[in-house]
Structure formats: C-alpha cells, structure tokens
C-alpha cells in the first residue's frame, strides 16, 4: 500500500470535470490505494473508480453501512449482503481488498433499537453483543465467501473507536480514522494509535486537511473566529500561519510532509478535485520529511481535545 492514497469523496462529474482522468493520473503517478464508499458522491465514486481501475493492479477499499440515521438495514443481514454484491458489481471486482464498517463508532450497528440522531454514537459505557450483530455475521460470511480480504473499521471519534477495537470479536486489519490527527488536532495519539499498534492494526489517516480548514490560510479567522474556533484553537492557527509565512511552505505541503513522517500511519488518504492538486500532493510526499526545526514547531501545535467527540469544530 502506497503511503499516499486517493480518497473518493469528491469523485463525481459534478465536482470534477473528468473524474476518471483524475483516477488514471493517480495510478500513473504510482498511487495504488483507492478508498471509496457507497455513500460517496451518491454512488458515483464507486462507479468511477470501477471504470477507471477495472484492469489495474491496485488496492481497493470500500465500506458497508451509512444508509440512514434509523436502524433499518443496519440490523438486516441481507441488506449488508446486497450492498456488498452491488459494490463488487460496480467496482468490477470479485473481491474487495479492504472492507470498512462505515462509522463503526455509531451504536446503530451494535444495538437492536431505533436510535435518534442525538444518540447515534457509541457511548464509552455501552455494553454490546458484537458477535450477534448482523454486521459481524455478515463480515464473517463475506470473508468465508472470499468477497473481502481484510476487515476494517472507520470513524471520527478516537475514544469510541478505541472502545470498538478493544471489544470487537473479529480480527481487525485496518483502521481509517478521519479528523483526529492533523497539523493542529491530535486526538488519535492519546489512545487510538497506541491501541491499534498494540493489536497490529494498520492505521490509515483520512481528512488530513480537516475538510478544508487546514487547506489554505484564513487570516480573517484571526480577527473574527468562526463559531467552531475557541480562543485556544485560534492561537494554534495563528502559530501555524506564522510557520507558513516564515517558511513559505503551503499548509497542504506542511500537512502531507508532517503526517507522512509519522511511522504509525500506513497511508494518508487525500481527496483531490483536480489533477493539479493531486500532482502537488504527490510532489509534497516525494519531498520527504520537513526539516527538523519546522517539524518540531508543528509538533508543539498539537491539541488533544478532551471531549468525547475529540474535536472542537
């Protein structure tokens, strides 16, 4: 698996003029890991990746779940089977290399009850019978059928993903975590990454730019911060912008080079909306680690947010 992967969230003709060309270019640049999901781009992401990579040797990851906020198909074994069979057909594959539970930190996978949106997340004190849940039965079946190679979980909450990893009965091979480790937010370093390392789980990092919040400087935020930014976070952004100003290195390059220097990560999944951005990300990766002084300054910016969500935005 290459240290840089292409995320499929934005892969649709509505957001990218020629999304298949973008995927082809990623492959030509040496990227061999592609992450998608039935949810992404209303299903277009899987179709585009399937068309672009039909005859290419690469590592494909997709996901199950994420139908709605109610229990519905989450408690239906046949719904999972149908979803996987549809994904394989669209991806033009007989087998998925890495198959994630999409947002495994949602209780709706593990509880046989209707769960309102305010209660969608697992709680640290919850007790679940993971083994009897339909998704676990489905994953067992899918592996036995040779339809998936590696089981993974994904999510956005470090504390709750740690709980699932510690309690889940099946072998977890991969963890895809988003929003929990970046230039500023480092919630995953507290318990999640150490737990994954202890259990020999490969850690794949998603949304390294916090869905655009760390993509480019926003000097106006230093004058009038957005609602999600508290005073402490504002000061960290101020310090980050100063590093950017002093070094002349873009925030995107700082992010890619800083994160790839961490040996705990198997791959960094980045989304691109055009070929130029994709090529820039690859060049950033090829540039190698940041100079030690710059790396250490960014290290000092790291923030572990104490709340269960692990973030303040």
Give the positions of each predicted feature:
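N-terminal binding-site loop/beta-alpha segment at the start of enzyme catalytic domains
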Residues: 1-62
């Amino acid at each position: 698996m290459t240290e840089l992967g292409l995320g499929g969230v934005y892969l649709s003709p509505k957001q990218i003029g020629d999304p298949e060309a973008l995927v082809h270019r990623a492959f030509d640049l040496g990227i061999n890991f592609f992450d998608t999901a039935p949810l992404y781009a209303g299903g277009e992401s899987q179709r585009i990746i399937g068309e672009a990579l039909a005859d290419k040797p690469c590592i494909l990851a997709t996901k199950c779940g994420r139908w709605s906020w109610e229990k519905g198909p989450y408690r239906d074994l046949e719904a999972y089977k149908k979803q996987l069979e549809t994904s394989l057909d669209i991806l033009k594959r007989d087998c998925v290399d890495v198959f994630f539970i999409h947002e495994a930190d949602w209780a709706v996978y593990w509880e046989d009850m209707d769960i309102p949106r305010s209660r969608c997340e697992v709680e640290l004190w919850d007790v679940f019978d993971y083994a009897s849940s339909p998704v676990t039965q489905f994953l067992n079946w899918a592996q036995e059928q040779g339809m998936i190679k590696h089981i993974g979980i994904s999510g956005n909450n470090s504390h709750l993903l740690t709980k699932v990893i510690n309690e889940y009965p099946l072998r977890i091979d991969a963890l895809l975590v988003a929003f929990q480790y970046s230039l500023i937010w480092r919630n995953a370093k507290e318990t999640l990454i150490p737990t994954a390392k202890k259990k020999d789980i490969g850690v794949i990092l998603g949304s390294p730019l916090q869905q655009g919040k760390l993509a480019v400087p926003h000097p106006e935020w230093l004058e009038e911060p957005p609602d999600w930014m508290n005073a402490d976070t504002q000061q960290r952004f101020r310090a980050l912008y100063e590093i950017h100003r002093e070094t002349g290195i873009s925030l995107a390059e700082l992010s890619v080079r800083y994160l790839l220097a961490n040996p705990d990560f198997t791959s960094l999944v980045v989304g691109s909306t055009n070929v130029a951005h994709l090529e820039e990300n690859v060049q950033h990766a090829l540039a190698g680690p940041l100079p030690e002084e710059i790396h250490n300054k960014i290290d000092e910016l790291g923030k572990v947010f104490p709340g269960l969500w692990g973030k303040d935005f």
